[in-house]
Amino acid sequence: MPSGTIHTLIKYDGNKFNEYRDFKDYIKYDNIKNIIEPFCGTASISFKIWEEYGDKFNYYINDKNEDILKYFEFHKKTNLNEFIDQFNIDKRQYDTQDKITVLYNEWCIYKDTYKYIILKKLTYMSLKMLRRDIKDRREYQIWETKSKVNKHQMKFQEFLNSPNVFITNNDWKECYNKYKDDNANLIIFDPPYVKSNNTNYNEDCRGLNVYENLNDINKDKAQSYFILEDIEETKELFKEWNILGTYPKTYSRSRRTTVHIVYKNIT
């Protein structure tokens, strides 16, 4: 079981924090004014670009998951030190799982955003994917936490509060269609993987549904990049796209290693 320091808030699931390093050299920023993520998730890609280039670009981060957007809005205006302080608990003070569950319920009773952060950031989930509708809360055990604000969390808060960062909660197609006709736009697609069973994703964001109308996307003016797992289904769909390169990716929880392909449209 985990012990020691657990950094709450801004935990990049799936090694997203480091993944940008693996594909950033494939992305060209010539004449680009706007960075768009239709599936922003934790917005780590836009964040890493911002860390490197600052407010040189506008950043449009979009996700249909309302919890994520609430999380961003909460994170923008919260004193992180005070917030994290209230969750620093010593497991030894709670000698049964019942007591920890009661504590969890007290935290979550009024604050949906707190509930999301606690479930995602303060609990040990093993290899289970977190379900949106939690019925048996005892599945998720709160362990000893000695959390503290780290430099990435403070920097991410600065990113969210930049006047060049715009947050939206729309369907990915609506987001994409708004920006597809301008060659000053760089659109980075990092959608849920085809074989993902993570029910946190909306139904229309899972499976091959998300890759509809790809031939049209391939011909639009905006520069579009897809970061996708190397599987036969996506290779067939993207056979007319430019392949810029590949890189290995190891998932932090399962230690499963896969190959990812960076695709770019023919614009």
What are these regions (language model features)?
Residues 28-34, 181-183:
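Short helix-loop-beta connector
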Residues 33-100:
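SAM cofactor-binding core of SAM-dependent methyltransferases
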Residues 201-267:
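Long, positively charged, glycine-interspersed low-complexity recognition regions
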